[in-house]
């Protein structure tokens, strides 16, 4: 039996989120609806999640001593990493000492904080199909890896980055240095290390949201959401939709891969598993042990969206991955580099049939920063995609004044 206390009282069930962007914000809202006291942590003030949490804290989450001091001061029962750039060895230490439970596990947070840990787990430990790859610490190593078998075209990504930052495709030798420089500019840490992957000529890519939650017998069960299709530009999601049709054999393979990876990572919660698909073939790409940006579409499509699934699973509550309606999401970009922007056209966006708009409340806009998302429902995915893109195009961020 799960017992939940009263927020802001001695009986409170306290959950701390490390990272409070738009995904964390929705997790915080889902937790609060279940009576949880929430603590939103980020590296800058007034992050989206901090605007809705009971408590807002700003620290350098990659600093182990700052992280340790905050957890010991706040005393949450659960710590939920929502980004990669965290001092995960400290989380492992605190979890091992019984100070706090990390979601899904501190080991999972460490392995997924960069592309190297999770790729080696999937390909080398679990033997799952992936693209051919090499890790490189210099421009010279990158060129050697490409010449030594990776070949062209190929994709270069920083070992640690998010939302496609620093990711590019190389079509020939003339693009290698530019790709290396772009990866160095887009990574989250100062030391330069990249993964170079052979390009897979896939038909489409999906996100398979995978939930590890307690069943009626108290044991962890694995459930899958309906596949989510998405379009990425330079590694960053621009639209997604659900359901995405798949050959039954490909779906079975995708679920096998997702189950293998998430079972090894362990714990409870929702995982976003990214996969490439060609016909009946499926390749593992990446996994995030938390809600996924492409999964924002589930706010339109599922009875329990990905954030509610994550909140329920980590609290030991039952979950349902049932689909409610076909739907789609489309990103609203900042368009300008400015603080405190204003948004025109929200009324026009909401006149598009069966649409919703989510503005994230980020204090600073950049031209390619995700500032909101349009959601749409329809009887079929194609109509939903058209509506979501139309609604997103209506919303125009601009400099205030």
UniProtKB/Swiss-Prot annotation:
Keywords, in A-Z order: ATP-binding, Ligase, Magnesium, Metal-binding, Nucleotide-binding, Purine biosynthesis
Residues noted as binding N(1)-(5-phospho-beta-D-ribosyl)glycinamide in the record, renumbered to the chain: 22-23, 82, 293, 362, 369-370
Record-listed E.C. numbers: 6.3.1.21
GO cellular component: cytosol
Superkingdom in the source lineage: Bacteria
Ranges of residues in domain ATP-grasp: 120-315
Record bears the keyword Magnesium: yes
Binding site for Mg(2+): 274, 286
Molecular functions (GO terms): ATP binding; magnesium ion binding; phosphoribosylglycinamide formyltransferase 2 activity; phosphoribosylglycinamide formyltransferase activity
Binding site for ATP: 115, 157, 162-167, 197-200, 205
A Pfam family per the record: RS_preATP-grasp-like
Catalysis: reaction(s): N(1)-(5-phospho-beta-D-ribosyl)glycinamide + formate + ATP = N(2)-formyl-N(1)-(5-phospho-beta-D-ribosyl)glycinamide + ADP + phosphate + H(+)
InterPro entries given in the database record: ATP-grasp (IPR011761), ATP-grasp_carboxylate-amine (IPR003135), ATP_grasp_subdomain_1 (IPR013815), PreATP-grasp_dom_sf (IPR016185), PurT (IPR005862), PurT/PurK_preATP-grasp (IPR054350), PurT_C (IPR048740), Rudment_hybrid_motif (IPR011054)
Keyword Repeat: no
UniProt pathway: Purine metabolism; IMP biosynthesis via de novo pathway; N(2)-formyl-N(1)-(5-phospho-D-ribosyl)glycinamide from N(1)-(5-phospho-D-ribosyl)glycinamide (formate route): step 1/1
BP terms from Gene Ontology: 'de novo' IMP biosynthetic process
Described purpose of this protein according to its UniProt entry: Involved in the de novo purine biosynthesis. Catalyzes the transfer of formate to 5-phospho-ribosyl-glycinamide (GAR), producing 5-phospho-ribosyl-N-formylglycinamide (FGAR). Formate is provided by PurU via hydrolysis of 10-formyl-tetrahydrofolate.
Subunit structure: Homodimer.
NCBIfam families the UniProt entry points to: PRK09288.1, purT
Family: Belongs to the PurK/PurT family.
Identification of the protein by name: Formate-dependent phosphoribosylglycinamide formyltransferase
UniProt source species: Cupriavidus pinatubonensis (strain JMP 134 / LMG 1197)
Organism lineage: Bacteria, Pseudomonadati, Pseudomonadota, Betaproteobacteria, Burkholderiales
Gene: purT
